[in-house]
Amino acid sequence: SSRRRHTRYQSLSRGLGDVYKRQAFRECGLDLRHDIVARIREVMREHCVELSEMAHRETGLGRAEDKVKKNTLVIEKTPGPEDLQTQTWTGDRGLTLTEPAPFGVIGAITPTTNPTATIINNTIAGVSAGNAIVFNAHPNAKAVSVHTIRLINAAITDAGGPSNLVTCVPEPTIESAQTLMNHPGVRILLVTGGPGVVEEARKTTKRGILAGPGNPPVVVDETADLELAGREIVRGASFDNNLICTDEKEVFVVASVADKLLESMVANGGYLLGEHELGKIERLIFTQAAHDGTPAKINPKWIGQNAGDILAAIGVRNADDRRLVVADVPVNHSLIWTEQMMPVMPVARVPDVDRAIELAVKAEHGCCHTASVFTRNVEVITRMAREIDVSIFVANAATLAGLGDGGEGFTSFSIASPTGEGLTRPRSLSRERRLAVAGGLRIV
């Protein structure tokens, strides 16, 4: 009703007003930001296991031990204020300086799949850039999200920062997310989630950093180290039960080495479905599937569930040690073309690497998100990287390497492919300001 909408708007306005009072934070300098970020990292380390287990209990998704790894990754490898860069030009006409400035208030939307990791990551990046943040968490993860934000605020005040620099909507809904995204007090949106929430953010007139879905393909050619490929594909695709958008979702393997790849996947924790078992899996996890090269409709009950539980549901016993369900399927099978977000990995045989790359580009659906290849041929790496045009491209490792887990570089849990920022970082959440001093400050 209009009364409920008005009340919701007033409540959010009061919260934003509280944040506005903290904008003195913008005057506190970089040293305080460094201190705050360091203290946030310390407190999050202390509560890492607690938050991981709480997220697992509340959402019912993924694996608690993998959530510990996710949280540890963002705690340690999200960039801080050191990511901000200034530029200076001097010449006969004086000096010009550009500096990264805060936007003010960030309106952030976070998913149920990675609730604490996304909040920690977004907070470190946003505060490093000098911003305040208002979160609208996923309703299915509201308790752990509120608890995480309380701990973060305690860390901020411990470091000498203002109280309630980071706040959240206490009872998040789709409607409260829409209110936040359209509120005049919010200067920039940071949205991490599925296609629905990304499209809602596109409808606003605000600057938006939008991290949407993906369907990351893997290509394995005849030159690949097949033991490495099998091990890394299982490691990546089974991580937190395939909840991360960067996790591997389908494999295209050159037919001459397909059997050896499947053997390696089984040796490293996979369970290869028999033909009769594949039909049972389809009926379990799909509510609708055409197997004509189009996406299926997924039964949400099985999203983020353990491979052993999925196998038990089709009558496979004593499979609790299996991390990944592996399905040998034709290229038009709906598993290939669907972002399942569960540990079920379709593997399709193709005649050569050219066909594998062609299909990988199609299966990625133009999300420009993530892809990977296993090959010893540098030309294949180069060609696929160019043709698939994704934000994260990984060669010869699990796609987790692209997030800094098993690879170099910083991490982010907001991969903004739709809007082009890629891995979101503090400089993504700042605006450039320029100072020009004509005829002065030139010392040579």
Q: What residues fall within each predicted segment?
A:
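Conserved C-terminal structural/oligomerization subdomain of aldehyde/semialdehyde dehydrogenase
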Residues: V316-V444
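Long amphipathic alpha-helix in the N-terminal Rossmann-like dinucleotide-binding domain
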Residues: R41-G91
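ALDH superfamily catalytic-core signature
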Residues: I120, H147, V198-V325, P330-V331
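Rossmann-like NAD(P) dinucleotide-binding subdomain of oxidoreductase/dehydrogenase enzymes
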Residues: T86-L228
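Structural signal for hydrophobic packing residues in well-ordered secondary-structure cores
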Residues: R22, R26-G29, I40-C48, S52-A55, ...
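Single conserved hydrophobic/aromatic residue that forms the stacking wall/gate
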Residues: S2-Y20
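Flexible, glycine/charged-enriched surface loops at secondary-structure junctions
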Residues: E27-D31, P162-V166, N241-C245, Y271-E282, ...
